[in-house]
Each structure stands twice: as C-alpha cells, then as structure tokens.
Amino acid sequence: MKKYLLTFVLFFETIILIAQSKPAYVLYNAKGKKVTYKKMIKQLIEKDVVLFGEFHNNPISHWLELSVAKDLAGKKAITFGAEMFEADNQQALNDYLAGKITAKGLDSAVRLWSNYKTDYAPLVNFAKEKNAPFIATNIPRRYAALVSKKGFEALDTIPALAKTW
C-alpha cells in the first residue's frame, strides 16, 4: 500500500512541476530578449500606437490582448481596432457600443467571425464599458474578393461612394 501511495504522490508532484514550467506565453522584445509582462506594459504606456498581432484562433493571444488593453486603459485614453470587423459595419458597431442595439442586434447586423463570442466580444465589451472608440479596420469582403479575383485595378471600377468604406 505504501508503495502505491508513494508512486501516486510522486506522479502528481511530477505533473505539478511540469505544469509549472510551461507558461501559456512568453514575451520578447524587438531584439528577441525575454521581457516581463510588467516591463512590457511600462513600455507600451509610453507609445502612441500599439498594434497587437494575434492568431485568430488562439484563445491565449485574445486573453493577453484583453489583459494588455485593460492595463493600458487604466493609464491612458485608448482606441481599439480589429480586422474582424469590416469597415462597412462601423455604424452597427458604433450603435452597439452606444447601447442602441443589443449583442443579438450586433450579431444580426454584422458578419461576426465564429469565435467572436469567446475571443473578441470581451474586448468589444471592455471598449463599451470604457466608452472607448472601436474601429472596424478591415476592408469589406466584397472588395477583398474583387481585388483577389481581378487585382487592385478592379477598385477603379467601383463608385467613389463605395470607396468610402
């Protein structure tokens, strides 16, 4: 019995030690040197623009994005932007942020990505809570498809009003 108990304890201690040595993320500066989250935030506070590159289907990057946003918003004015929103959906996004439509209304009005609720909604709702602007930064799909099929010259064929998106 003692043998089984000792094996059980050693097994779980090993798992705990292994789990502690595998962080969910590691941060590096521009020179490839590891930096702490605290140091990164201290440096980002001094910047006018912070661009956050992320993998669309990586929940850790979205969690980190929200954490950075919360820490920066506590220190300075912040404006958000995301390519998951297309520019022609800006008004619906503004209406949601202003409380004129519900989350369900936003879902009906905008072409949301499949991971919106889990990965992007927390950031959008944080912007809403802070009354911070949120910019729809992506080109509308129909124009992206047009360029993909016919090249950038195809944009010359669309009306000037359409180009305001």
Where are the model-predicted features located?
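Bacterial Sec-dependent N-terminal signal peptides
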Residues: 1-23
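Short, basic, glycine/proline-bearing loop/turn elements
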Residues: 21-26, 48-55, 104-111
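N- or domain-start disorder-to-order transition segments that initiate the globular core
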Residues: 18-47
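Solvent-exposed loop/turn segments at secondary-structure junctions
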Residues: 55-59, 85-89, 140-144
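N-terminal, post-signal-peptide region of Sec/Tat-exported proteins
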Residues: 45-78, 84
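Solvent-exposed, acidic/flexible segments
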Residues: 33, 37, 58-65, 90, ...
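Post-signal peptide N-terminal segment of secreted/secretory-pathway proteins
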Residues: 57, 65, 69, 91-101
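A substrate-binding/cap region within the structured catalytic cores of diverse enzymes
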Residues: 79, 92-165
